């Protein structure tokens, strides 16, 4: 079994790179790609950059070059519900674009025309995540809908618009839906594992993000490593 793991930022990937046995590194244009084994599992680690276009291009390269059986997106996210705290993990039940609007043509809000409205996380990967969070009892884990778009959500207007359109949202980030859509197009199952770096309703969320990002990224990596141990 081959697992592709993709992240937007070096801080979200470096701890996994450091765990690689028999590591190899390649560059494709401005993208960096590492292969090797973690706990005996063949993996490829891909640094895609921030935002949905970078994520889609990176995921496409990862799928084409490595041909993984499963795709995991690791990284950080902002939390919507007040009971989700900095450093907690959110496992995607589904992921949607929040910044796509083709409702004039009877598509759902967030739905790209001719694509699903929501991309469902793979059941096998969800099962691995559930086993992993039992083992990682020092981290609180939540499962629910995740939204993606090309903005850092922090203003009252942004927050209100998202909550009106997607009242069940648990976390928001900038790459997951593009990665999920790419996986859908290539028939490769996926899951998002995101740790909370900021809470969108708190003042100064960008400063909180800067302070918390490395800790949150490390927690997300811990969860992914626990999942790999379950394979």
Curated annotation (Swiss-Prot):
Single GO MF descriptor: methylthioadenosine nucleosidase activity
Membrane-spanning residues: none
Pathway: Amino-acid biosynthesis; L-methionine biosynthesis via salvage pathway; S-methyl-5-thio-alpha-D-ribose 1-phosphate from S-methyl-5'-thioadenosine (hydrolase route): step 1/2
Record-level GO BP terms: L-methionine salvage from methylthioadenosine; L-methionine salvage from S-adenosylmethionine; nucleoside catabolic process
GO-annotated cellular components: cytosol
Enzyme Commission number, as recorded: 3.2.2.9
Catalysed transformations (reactions): S-adenosyl-L-homocysteine + H2O = S-(5-deoxy-D-ribos-5-yl)-L-homocysteine + adenine; S-methyl-5'-thioadenosine + H2O = 5-(methylsulfanyl)-D-ribose + adenine; 5'-deoxyadenosine + H2O = 5-deoxy-D-ribose + adenine
Superkingdom in the source lineage: Bacteria
Residues the record marks as active site: 12, 198
Gene3D superfamilies for the chain: Nucleoside phosphorylase domain (3.40.50.1580)
Alphabetical list of InterPro entries matching this protein: MTA_SAH_Nsdase (IPR010049), Nucleoside_phosphorylase_d (IPR000845), Nucleoside_phosphorylase_sf (IPR035994)
Keyword annotations: Amino-acid biosynthesis, Hydrolase, Methionine biosynthesis
Annotated binding of substrate, by residue: 78, 153, 174-175
Biological role: Catalyzes the irreversible cleavage of the glycosidic bond in both 5'-methylthioadenosine (MTA) and S-adenosylhomocysteine (SAH/AdoHcy) to adenine and the corresponding thioribose, 5'-methylthioribose and S-ribosylhomocysteine, respectively. Also cleaves 5'-deoxyadenosine, a toxic by-product of radical S-adenosylmethionine (SAM) enzymes, into 5-deoxyribose and adenine.
Protein family according to the UniProt entry: Belongs to the PNP/UDP phosphorylase family. MtnN subfamily.
Protein name, per record: 5'-methylthioadenosine/S-adenosylhomocysteine nucleosidase
Source organism (scientific name): Maridesulfovibrio salexigens (strain ATCC 14822 / DSM 2638 / NCIMB 8403 / VKM B-1763)
Gene designation: mtnN
């Amino acid at each position: 079994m081959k697992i592709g793991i993709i992240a937007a930022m070096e801080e979200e990937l470096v701890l996994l790179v450091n765990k690689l046995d028999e590591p190899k590194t390649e560059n494709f244009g401005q993208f960096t790609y590492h292969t090797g084994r973690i706990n005996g599992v063949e993996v490829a680690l891909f640094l895609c950059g921030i935002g949905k276009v970078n994520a889609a291009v990176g995921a496409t390269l990862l799928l084409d070059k490595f041909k993984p059986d499963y795709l995991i997106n690791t990284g950080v996210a902002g939390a919507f519900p007040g009971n989700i705290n900095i450093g907690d993990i959110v496992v995607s039940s589904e992921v949607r674009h929040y910044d796509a609007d083709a409702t004039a043509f009877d598509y759902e809000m967030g739905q790209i025309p001719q694509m699903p409205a929501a991309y469902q996380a793979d059941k096998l990967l969800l099962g691995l995540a559930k086993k992993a969070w039992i083992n990682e009892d020092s981290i609180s884990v939540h499962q629910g809908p995740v939204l993606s778009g090309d903005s850092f959500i922090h203003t009252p207007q942004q927050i209100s618009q998202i909550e009106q359109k997607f009242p069940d949202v648990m976390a928001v980030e900038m790459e997951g839906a593009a990665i999920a859509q790419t996986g859908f197009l290539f028939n490769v199952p996926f899951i998002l594992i995101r740790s909370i770096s900021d809470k969108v309703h708190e003042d100064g969320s960008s400063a909180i993000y800067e302070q918390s990002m490395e800790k949150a990224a490390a927690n997300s990596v811990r969860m992914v490593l626990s999942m790999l141990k379950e394979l």
